[in-house]
């Protein structure tokens, strides 16, 4: 609070290759002293320019508040920070670096992840990335992840086939608002032992067919195809990758990427299968190979299928050991003294996974959360309050998302481990689940949890009491 010392132990900017890289790695730059951190100021402007996501999240998890009322949950915790490349191996490198650094200091490690993707391997908890996460969890690392912000986005279809077909419109993100937009990425996962086929149709604004690709089967298609559909003087480009049986789960899968058409054409996904169930997701993709917000599958009339917002949890929140966090509005008192808030966030992604595993695990406040902003950001925001320090102004502002609810839980996990450092990640997760609270918004939740709320709302006080082994009656004001 006095701003006398930094609590950031080290940071690894994987985008900056001037070095020095961390020991054992050949890329990125590590900052391991207060002087290095101060001189660096911020991470490299990368695919998101100079953002403020990480600063806001860190402030929620454990910010000191800098003399304001906006103090984080575990406000005496220390930090390791990584800006990682969009690559599975880079993510695992970041985890390994964090674990080694924490082990060297004799500290427990909580990894908070406020990112999510739908194309980084299988999203059923069985991918190699999820297996790596589970392995680190078995070594004592606790992982907390945001559930995602695709609630209300009808970007998913679950289709049961019996020698029939599926037609649905692939809606595209507005290309005039994002210079790095590439198009849409449709991800499809089928039933183990089955096969399915995909392709596209191109319609004009009157829904008349003007072009069409062939069907590509997961059973016979080579790993990668680059192709196009010619429509008059225009061309609709697409590419496709397939697996007959994905190595980690045995499921047939296809990733169909369609570049946004230059004209006013409508692109339709066509798919067919002799039997089995196939899940489809329609996700925006940028030129940098990222993008995690869904766009709707919609109907164009008879014979078409519209999407839904179910099964919206991506990687890494789908991992079995991870604590996946949904969002809701925090309670507050109105000027008249009435208790308000508590409703679920309409943007919070819902479960379950495609193998029916229950996710999310828990929910926490994630709407209009006030926290610290990066003083280097070029993002637009409304300042709530500011602190001047060393001739620089540091703002606090409100943001919403499961990126805000996840660090709340990460901070609670840090408090739990501070109370009882001997707990395993599985025990920590169990404490959070068993002490979760219900209210008039959640209703009575089933023992197995709920696809919107998980096992309920986080109860920090009771969770820490349980970690301490304290037995007693606790009255929590809803």
In which residue ranges do the predicted regions lie?
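Conserved, well-structured beta-alpha core segment at the onset of a catalytic domain
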Residues: 1-4, 107-109, 118-145, 150-195
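Subtilisin-like serine protease catalytic core
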Residues: 1-90, 106, 110, 138-142, ...
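Extracellular S/T/G-rich loop segment that most often corresponds to the catalytic His/Ser-adjacent loop
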Residues: 12, 16-19, 25-32, 154-255, ...
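Solvent-exposed, polar/charged alpha-helical surfaces in well-ordered, non-transmembrane soluble domains
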Residues: 55-59, 89, 93-96, 100, ...
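Ser/Thr/Pro-rich, low-complexity mucin-like regions
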Residues: 88, 99, 257-281
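C-terminal subdomain of the subtilisin-like protease fold in secreted/lumenal serine endopeptidases
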Residues: 104-121, 125-127, 136-147, 153-156, ...
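Long, charge-dense accessory insertions within large macromolecular proteins
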Residues: 276-309, 324-330
């Amino acid at each position: 609070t006095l701003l006398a010392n930094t609590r950031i132990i080290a940071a690894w900017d994987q985008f900056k290759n001037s070095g020095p890289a961390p020991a054992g790695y050949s890329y990125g730059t590590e900052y391991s002293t207060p002087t290095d951190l101060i001189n660096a100021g911020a991470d490299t402007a990368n695919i998101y320019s100079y953002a403020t996501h990480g600063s806001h999240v860190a402030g929620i998890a454990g910010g000191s508040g800098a003399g304001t009322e906006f103090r984080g949950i575990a406000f005496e915790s220390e930090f390791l920070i990584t800006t990682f490349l969009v690559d599975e191996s880079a993510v695992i490198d970041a985890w390994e670096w964090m674990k080694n650094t924490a082990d060297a200091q004799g500290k427990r490690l909580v990894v908070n992840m406020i990112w999510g993707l739908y194309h980084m391997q299988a999203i059923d908890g069985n991918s190699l990335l999820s297996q790596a996460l589970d392995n680190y969890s078995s070594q004592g690392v606790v992982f907390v992840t945001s559930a995602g912000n695709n609630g209300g986005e009808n970007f998913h279809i679950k289709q049961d086939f019996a020698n029939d077909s599926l037609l649905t419109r692939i809606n595209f993100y507005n290309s005039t608002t994002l210079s790095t937009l590439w198009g849409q990425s449709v991800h499809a996962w089928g039933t183990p032992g089955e096969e399915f086929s995909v392709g596209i149709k191109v319609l004009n604004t009157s829904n008349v067919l003007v072009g069409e690709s062939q069907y590509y089967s997961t059973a016979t298609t080579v790993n990668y195809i680059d192709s196009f559909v010619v429509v008059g003087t225009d061309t609709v480009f697409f590419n496709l990758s397939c697996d007959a049986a994905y190595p980690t789960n045995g499921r047939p899968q296809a990733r169909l990427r369609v570049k946004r058409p230059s004209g006013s054409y409508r692109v339709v996904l066509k798919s067919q299968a002799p039997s089995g169930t196939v899940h489809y997701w329609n996700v925006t993709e940028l030129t940098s190979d990222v993008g995690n917000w869904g766009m709707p599958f919609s109907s164009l009339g008879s014979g078409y299928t519209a999407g839904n917002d179910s099964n919206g949890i991506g990687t890494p929140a789908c991992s079995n050991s991870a604590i996946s966090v949904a969002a809701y509005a925090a309670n507050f008192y109105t000027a008249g003294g009435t208790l308000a808030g508590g409703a679920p966030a309409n943007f919070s992604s819902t479960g379950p996974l495609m193998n029916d595993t229950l996710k999310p695990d828990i929910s926490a406040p994630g709407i209009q959360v006030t926290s610290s902003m990066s003083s280097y950001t070029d993002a637009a925001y409304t300042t709530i309050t500011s602190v001047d320090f060393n001739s620089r102004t540091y703002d606090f502002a409100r943001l919403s998302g499961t990126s805000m609810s996840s660090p709340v839980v990460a901070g609670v996990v840090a408090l739990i481990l501070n109370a009882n450092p001997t707990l395993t990640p599985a025990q920590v997760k169990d404490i959070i689940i068993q002490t979760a609270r219900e209210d008039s918004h959640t209703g009575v939740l089933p023992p197995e949890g709920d696809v919107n709320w998980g096992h309920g709302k986080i109860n920090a006080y009771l969770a820490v009491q349980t970690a301490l082994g304290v037995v007693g009656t606790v009255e929590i004001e809803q």
